[in-house]
Amino acid sequence: MALRACSSSLVARSAARSVQPFRPAAVRPARIAPVARKTATVVCSAATDAPAAPVAEAVVGEVKSGVAHLKFQRGSADKIRRVLDVIRGRSYEEALVLCEYMPYRACEKIIKCLMSAAANAKHNKGALKTKLVVSECFADEGPVLKRARPRAQGRANLIMKPTFHMTIRVEERAQ
């Protein structure tokens, strides 16, 4: 008898929980993220399927930018992102100074990639390093190296050694 009372209360509790109804993609609000293209058209559809209206059809001049990739580096992508979030949107020189004085090991790899991106912008597009801004930077997870550590009685523990891929883009500041 006690078992029946217990099971019926579980059913009542689970029925009382609020269950979110499934909403199809057309009804769900989309992330609003305008993307500027060469013709300066804003690409966005917020909660509707209507196409976005062009903002201005003026052709934007070529932006002097440089990109650098660092791939298959040992370390956690989360620890890299912690520093990348700080330097995003800052000037090249300010980002270098910040990374030099931060107490994280990830900063060494970020400085290497940042200097490479600035050198690419200067060499390929003729950009001035004093006018560069970190416009985009992100880190993705790479493959995980799996190793075994011997334990007692013939067992083994799995050791995970994560890797990451990092991309930094610098652009010349518009005056």
UniProtKB/Swiss-Prot annotation:
SUPFAM superfamilies: Ribosomal protein L22 (SSF54843)
Gene disruption phenotype: Cells are erythromycin and tylosin resistant. Ery2 mutants (formerly called ery-M2) are cold-sensitive for growth at 15 degrees Celsius. Resistance and cold sensitivity are recessive to the wild-type allele. At least one mutant (ery2-4 formerly ery-M2d) has fewer chloroplast ribosomes than the wild-type.
Keyword ATP-binding found: no
GO CC annotation: chloroplast; large ribosomal subunit
Subcellular location as annotated: Plastid, Chloroplast
UniProt keyword annotations, A-Z: Antibiotic resistance, Chloroplast, Plastid, Ribonucleoprotein, Ribosomal protein, RNA-binding, rRNA-binding, Transit peptide
Biological processes annotated in GO: response to antibiotic; translation
Listed PROSITE patterns: RIBOSOMAL_L22 (PS00464)
GO MF, any single term: rRNA binding
Targeting signal (transit peptide) range: 1-43
Transmembrane helix found in the keyword field: no
Transmembrane annotation, as ranges: none
Gene3D superfamilies: Ribosomal protein L22/L17
Domain of life, per lineage: Eukaryota
Listed InterPro entries: Ribosomal_uL22, Ribosomal_uL22_bac/chlpt-type, Ribosomal_uL22_bac/org-type, Ribosomal_uL22_CS, Ribosomal_uL22_sf
Description of how the protein assembles with itself and partners: Part of the 50S ribosomal subunit.
Record function comment: This protein binds specifically to 23S rRNA. The globular domain of the protein is located near the polypeptide exit tunnel on the outside of the subunit, while an extended beta-hairpin is found that lines the wall of the exit tunnel in the center of the 70S ribosome.
Similarity section: Belongs to the universal ribosomal protein uL22 family.
Name of protein: Large ribosomal subunit protein uL22c
Organism in which the protein naturally occurs: Chlamydomonas reinhardtii
Gene expressing this chain: ERY2
